[in-house]
Amino acid sequence: MHDHLFYTASVHRDNPGALVVQESFSFPRLYLALGVTTMRTTGSNEPYADLYLQRHIEDGRVVGPHINVTAPYLEGAGTQFAQMHELKDANEAREFVDFWANEGAGSFKAYMHVTRAELGAAIAEAHKRRVTLTGHLCSVTFREAAELGIDDLEHGFIVATDFTPDKQPDVCPPGGTQKYFLQVDAHSAPFQDLIRFLISHHVAITSTLPVFELSAPGRPAPASMTRGLDTLADFARLNYLTLRAASHSNPNNHGAEALKKEMELERAFAAAGGMLLAGPDPTGSGGVVAGFGDLREVELLVEAGFSSAEAIHIATSNGAQFLGLLDRIGTLAPGKNADLVLIHGDPSKDIAEIEKVETVFKDGVGYDSAKLIESVRGQVGIR
C-alpha cells in the first residue's frame, strides 16, 4: 500500500533540481517476485510511465502486479523535488484531481507543503470521482486532515505535526517533529484522543516501518534487506552505503528510539480499532528495495507486537479492503483471484520464513521468484 515505482537514493538528492529515477523495469518484477500481486504506487513522479506500465501489465506484455496508480503528488509551494508541481490554490487542486482522474489515476496523495484549503478541495473532488486520497503531511496536522475527510495517512505518527508546539497553520514546522514525537505517550489523553478522532472519521494509517529502520543504527541487517541490496547497480549501492554511514555516525541520530516509538503508537492505534495498512516506502537512503521491503514490513509488524497472522492480515486483507477489492483479493476463497504465494517454511511459527518465497501465483499463473529476482540483478537505480 506504499509501493513506489521510483528510486531516490543519491548523495546529491538534496541538491536543487535533483531527479528521482523511474524503475519501470526492475521494480514490477521484484514486487511480483516477493509476493506482491496488487500494489498502490502512493505518489508518482512519472505518472504517464506508471499508467503505461499498468496498461502493459494488464495486457500481458509486461510482468508485474496489478497496479493502483496514484496521481502525481498534490504538493504546495516549497517542494524540494523538481518533478513535483506546486499548487497555487484550492481551485487548481480541484482541477488537478479532475484532470488526473480523467487520465486514469486510481488514487491521490497530498504532500508535505499542501495547505488546508488545497487539501480540502482535492479531497472533495477525489470523493466526487469515487477515488481515495491519502497524505504524507507536515503543513497540515492529522486532526485537520481528518476533519477535511482524508482517507488515509502515510508513515504513521512519526510525521504527524499534531504534537509540535506553536505549529503555525499551513506551515511545516522548521525544526522538524522528531523531538516532540519521541515524547508522545501512547496511553496519554492527547494521543488517545487523536486516535479516537481518526477512527471516528474512518481514517486509515499506513505503516512504513522499513524506511525508518534504515535510520536506526545498531540493528542487525535482516536477510530481506541484504538480498535487496544485491539487486542494486554499483553506483546505487555506493550511494546507499555512503548515506547510511553518514546517518548512523551522526551523534544526534535517534532513529532506533523513533522506530520503537512508532511501533508502539501503531500498535495502540490498531488496538483501539483503527485500520492499519502496510507498505515499505522504497525511498530514503535506498536500502528499502521493492518486494524485499514489503516482506520486511511484515516482519517489523511482528516485532511491534502483532502476531504473524495479524501482520499478514494487515498487509493483505486490510489493503484489499481499503482499495475496495476485498471481494476479489486479500484472502483465499472460492471465486476470488488465484493470487497466492508458496513459501518454503511456516511464517506462522517464524515470521522470518516469509522471506523464503519460491513461487508466486497471480491470476492463476505461477512465477519463479528466484528467476524474476535474477533478471533484474544490478539494475535497481538504473531502470
Predicted regions and their residues:
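Divalent metal-binding pocket/active-site signature
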Residues: 106-154, 209-214, 258-260
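Active-site gating/metal-coordination segments in enzymes
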Residues: 72, 77-129, 172-177, 182-185
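Acidic, glycine-enriched loop/beta-strand segments at the rims
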Residues: 289, 307-312, 321-357
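Divalent metal-coordination and catalytic microenvironments
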Residues: 35, 67, 104, 126, ...
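Metal-associated gating/positioning segment near the N- to mid-region
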Residues: 1-61, 80, 85, 91, ...
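Surface-exposed amphipathic alpha-helices with a cationic face
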Residues: 54-58, 119-130, 199, 267-270
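Active-site neighborhoods of metal-dependent hydrolases
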Residues: 99-109, 114, 159-304, 377, ...
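Divalent metal-dependent hydrolysis catalytic cores, especially in the metallo-beta-lactamase
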Residues: 26-48, 65-72, 102-114, 132-134, ...
